[in-house]
């Protein structure tokens, strides 16, 4: 490996420490009292314990005791402002119809529809560390992955491999496999999968770089997750990108579990392309519109040979990728918008964009640096309580498989249970008003989100979790 592996490795983040009184309700409440981010919780609808188990549609019982919602890594909670934004959109549509495409209404929180995707891109850019022109809000994650692989995966008989992780999220795996097949190659030969060492769940940066060294001469693309969905491991995006590019490789990232969760600097890290969803940490709603990053060097449009012969990177074209100045000329001469917007295909859903703009308005009141500082302390507190609340247990009923190093994780902790405990424990947690995500065969993913979760949530969760574990052990 080259020297870049040592030079670019980030320094470790210092893990917070907690006093001997950490495992008390009073201590958790004192942390909340000093939390400068606590004001954001009131901007979300926290489901009540009663409603979380409802079997019919009900209005949120705001007067009831709140559930403990640790599932923002699967679906973020609804911001209160979403209803206002959606109503404004519906009122615009009902009152001025098609004119909503081109007319701003003074008393609306939304801009005209044709500019809404551009506005959302400007809101989202700081969250992923990009220029606004490098971000496009469009489609869904896997669709965007296919669109960008059509542009960035250009295999040849000599170089057709894709370096990826061994247990990618199934949709990513299917997309990669189908792209390889579509180009006429064998996925079993072209998919290079990197896994952890035996007995570990972490994939080291060093192993990734060694794999790049081993396969660089036959590889067309490196495509990895920013955060591994099952273990919660945060990959060293900066180092891996720089090293792979030093070997002449294109590097793409699936940031589904990283965007809105951890600080990113996609432009400065020179990432070629990335995709993400917005329904997890960005709280835009189930199946909401997704995001794509294309570095500015790949979005350039060159008119040096004249207006009729623009030069640009190959992509799958659609009318919404055309420059706004000539989009409605209908002359069938494609002139792409410069930047990521030139990779758009179809008119984006205004309903989806409306929900997203509402959710992002909360992010625009803070910064990823502030969010990550609370993540650091909130998740460290969760880890501390889980590991110290039963110190005398010589045969622990669980293992945390997420890296202990806070620089190698976001908010999520993945708790690996003993075999056969998952369903029973999950049912107990749900009955107690806790929402967490279970992943078969034996993992519960716990994600306290800094925008709406509290230290008291963490403390109460651990008490209930430990009691449920005891019952499982006795059964």
Swiss-Prot record:
Modified positions (N6-(pyridoxal phosphate)lysine) in chain numbering: 280
Keywords: Cytoplasm, Hydrolase, Pyridine nucleotide biosynthesis, Pyridoxal phosphate
Gene Ontology process terms (BP): 'de novo' NAD biosynthetic process from L-tryptophan; anthranilate metabolic process; L-kynurenine catabolic process; L-tryptophan catabolic process to kynurenine; quinolinate biosynthetic process
PANTHER family: KYNURENINASE, KYNURENINASE 2
EC number assigned by the record: 3.7.1.3
Gene3D superfamilies: Aspartate Aminotransferase, domain 1, Type I PLP-dependent aspartate aminotransferase-like (Major domain)
Family membership: Belongs to the kynureninase family.
Protein name per the record: Kynureninase
Record's keyword annotation contains Transferase: no
The keyword RNA-binding belongs to this UniProt entry's keyword annotation: no
Predominant location: cytoplasm
Cofactor(s) demanded: pyridoxal 5'-phosphate
Pfam families attached to this UniProt entry: KYNU_C (PF22580)
Domain of life: Eukaryota
Function: Catalyzes the cleavage of L-kynurenine (L-Kyn) and L-3-hydroxykynurenine (L-3OHKyn) into anthranilic acid (AA) and 3-hydroxyanthranilic acid (3-OHAA), respectively.
Transmembrane segments: none
